[in-house]
């Protein structure tokens, strides 16, 4: 597996690539969700490379080996779509996009903003949702009032980070248990 860095503006993006560079097929680009990395796509990379596709998986900005800008404003869907378009350019300028979880809105948005670069989109677990009359966070506050909703939990800067950093081993056990990979 090859690993490259793609630069978009002042952000470096880590990308894993498998499959023949001279594939007759359009390349596939996989975009992960939360809390994942491009590594999450390793089995799909091996499978599609075995079928003769050039396939890549990026670490979205803020994750893994990609840069992590501090400013919240650095994480708009437009910027994430721009990152995805930059990786598509590095793969040859046009690609098929796979997106899972948070990666699905990223690939849908990339297709809308950079339609000349996107041949097809597979959005896994999250359908395309057009912009509504109410901003998402306002709607989530209404729908989940008085209930835990993880996306709302992460909105106030520093709260979740402090809780996670207080006991990283306990957090790791929770995630391993939820994934079915708990060893204790």
Residue ranges of predicted features:
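Solvent-exposed, non-membrane alpha-helical residues enriched in polar/charged side chains
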Residues: 3-4, 46, 85, 89
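Flexible "cap/lid" subdomain of the alpha/beta-hydrolase fold that forms the substrate-access gate
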Residues: 12-13, 19-21, 27, 63-98, ...
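Conserved HGGG/HGGXW glycine-rich cap/lid loop of the alpha/beta-hydrolase fold
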Residues: 16-68, 100
């Amino acid at each position: 597996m090859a690993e490259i860095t793609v630069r978009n503006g002042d952000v470096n993006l880590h990308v894993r690539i498998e499959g023949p560079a001279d594939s007759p097929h359009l390349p596939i680009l996989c975009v992960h969700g939360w809390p994942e990395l491009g590594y999450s796509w390793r089995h799909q990379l091996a499978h599609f490379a075995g079928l003769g596709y050039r396939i890549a998986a990026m670490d979205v900005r803020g994750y893994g080996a990609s840069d992590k800008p501090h400013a919240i404003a650095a994480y708009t869907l437009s910027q994430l779509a721009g990152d995805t378009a930059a990786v598509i350019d590095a793969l040859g300028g046009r690609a098929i996009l796979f997106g899972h979880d948070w990666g699905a809105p990223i690939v849908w948005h990339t297709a809308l903003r950079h339609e000349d670069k996107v041949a097809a989109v597979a959005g896994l677990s999250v359908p395309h949702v057009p912009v509504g009359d109410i901003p998402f966070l306002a709607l989530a506050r209404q729908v989940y009032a008085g209930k835990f909703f993880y996306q709302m939990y992460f909105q106030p800067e520093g709260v979740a980070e402090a809780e996670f950093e207080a006991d990283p081993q306990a957090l790791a056990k929770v995630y391993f248990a939820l994934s079915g990979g708990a060893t204790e």
